């Protein structure tokens, strides 16, 4: 008997690297999207931490009035933020090498652009990595589709809105009070609370929270009893066990009697699809709303829409909101312009008799 031994070609270094990158046996899956995700998110995180602690004030409005955002310049965790790139820069790509010095780059808010653009690349790659791992494991792709909702929301406030408004200085500041400031100014300029897509987003987030709490509490409550009536049902289970611990038929029966029969799911797959789709679709709509308001297609305006027979305005809640919007608008960027845009746009009365 003759044995033929074939010498196996040793795999190249590149081949071993590719196998390691795409291996599903690693403790944390890397993947080709991860090759870009890891450096971009590390960069965004590192610069965020350094800038939040030590960045000097930024001339956000481009009028030589720097605004302090870092901890070392007098802020705390609540008031601190990464101040958006200066209006003097607008939408220009502003890496460090485009500035005359690092001091100039910091003064004009260069770190904001650096953080935001790396962050958006990173989270987009994280979404791609979710799809890639699902593909390698033979799973369906809906995890990445669900994650597209927060990715779209982040892209809307950090990229699409500044593009529509013409400057990164209009992007959302990276901090707690900065986020609230962004929301208040957004309401003042775009009447977002009266936009149907924002309403759908509110229904998505609040409804998703409600459905998540209902589902979790119902599953936890409808245990398959493994004990006698005289001891706690909890004694029949150990945390993380593989065996099924709840009965969907019992849960369906409970909920069907609590509300009505057809308000309850008796199919686990359709139930979980609903739990995923409701908040995702809501947040998609909100991101779409921000992206349309970026180009000044604003919320509904019912101001002074109710009048009496003499043509006198009967104030409604729309007029109250309008008055609040004007108040918020005159308070922000108070030194950048003399009047809010709504007032400045009104035609001056004729004075020639």
Curated annotation (Swiss-Prot):
Residues reported in the UniProt entry to bind a quinone: 215, 264-265
Cofactor note: The D1/D2 heterodimer binds P680, chlorophylls that are the primary electron donor of PSII, and subsequent electron acceptors. It shares a non-heme iron and each subunit binds pheophytin, quinone, additional chlorophylls, carotenoids and lipids. D1 provides most of the ligands for the Mn4-Ca-O5 cluster of the oxygen-evolving complex (OEC). There is also a Cl(-1) ion associated with D1 and D2, which is required for oxygen evolution. The PSII complex binds additional chlorophylls, carotenoids and specific lipids.
Positions with a binding annotation for chlorophyll a PD1: 198
Keywords: Acetylation, Calcium, Chlorophyll, Chloroplast, Chromophore, Electron transport, Herbicide resistance, Iron, Magnesium, Manganese, Membrane, Metal-binding, Oxidoreductase, Phosphoprotein, Photosynthesis, Photosystem II, Plastid, Thylakoid, Transmembrane, Transmembrane helix, Transport
Record: residues binding Fe cation: 215, 272
Subunit structure: PSII is composed of 1 copy each of membrane proteins PsbA, PsbB, PsbC, PsbD, PsbE, PsbF, PsbH, PsbI, PsbJ, PsbK, PsbL, PsbM, PsbT, PsbX, PsbY, PsbZ, Psb30/Ycf12, at least 3 peripheral proteins of the oxygen-evolving complex and a large number of cofactors. It forms dimeric complexes.
Protein name as it appears in the record: Photosystem II protein D1
Organism from which the protein derives: Panax ginseng (Korean ginseng)
Taxonomic classification: Eukaryota, Viridiplantae, Streptophyta, Embryophyta, Tracheophyta
Gene: psbA
């Amino acid at each position: 008997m003759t044995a033929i031994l074939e010498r196996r070609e040793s795999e190249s270094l590149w081949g071993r690297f590719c196998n390691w990158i795409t291996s599903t046996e690693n403790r944390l899956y890397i993947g080709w999207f991860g090759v870009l995700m890891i450096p971009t998110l590390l960069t965004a995180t590192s610069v965020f931490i350094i800038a939040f602690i030590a960045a000097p004030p930024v001339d956000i409005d481009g009028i030589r009035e720097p605004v302090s955002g870092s901890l070392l310049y007098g802020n705390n965790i609540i008031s601190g933020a990464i101040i958006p790139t200066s209006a003097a820069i607008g939408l220009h790509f502003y890496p460090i090498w485009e500035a005359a010095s690092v001091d100039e780059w910091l003064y004009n808010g260069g770190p904001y652009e650096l953080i935001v653009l790396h962050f958006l690349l990173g989270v987009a790659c994280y979404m791609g990595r979710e799809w890639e791992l699902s593909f390698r494991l033979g799973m369906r792709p809906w995890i990445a589709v669900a994650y597209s909702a927060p990715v779209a929301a982040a892209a809307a406030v950090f990229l699409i809105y500044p593009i529509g408004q013409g400057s990164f200085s209009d992007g959302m500041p990276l901090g707690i009070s900065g986020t609230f400031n962004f929301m208040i100014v957004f309401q003042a300029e775009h009447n977002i609370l009266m936009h149907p897509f924002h309403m759908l987003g509110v229904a998505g987030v609040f409804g998703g929270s409600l459905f998540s709490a209902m589902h979790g509490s119902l599953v936890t409550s409808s245990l398959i009893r493994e004990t006698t009536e005289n001891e706690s049902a909890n004694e029949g289970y150990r945390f993380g066990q593989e065996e099924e611990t709840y009965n969907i038929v019992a849960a369906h029966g409970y909920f069907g009697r609590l509300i009505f029969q057809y308000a309850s799911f008796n199919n686990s797959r359709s139930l979980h699809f609903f739990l995923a789709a409701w908040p995702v679709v809501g947040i998609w709509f909100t991101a779409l709303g921000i992206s349309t308001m970026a180009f000044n297609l604003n919320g509904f305006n019912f101001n002074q829409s109710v009048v009496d027979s003499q043509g006198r305005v009967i104030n409604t809640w729309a007029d109250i909101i309008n008055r609040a919007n004007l108040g918020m608008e005159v308070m922000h960027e108070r030194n950048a312009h003399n009047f809010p845009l709504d007032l400045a746009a009104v035609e001056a009365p004729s004075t020639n008799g």
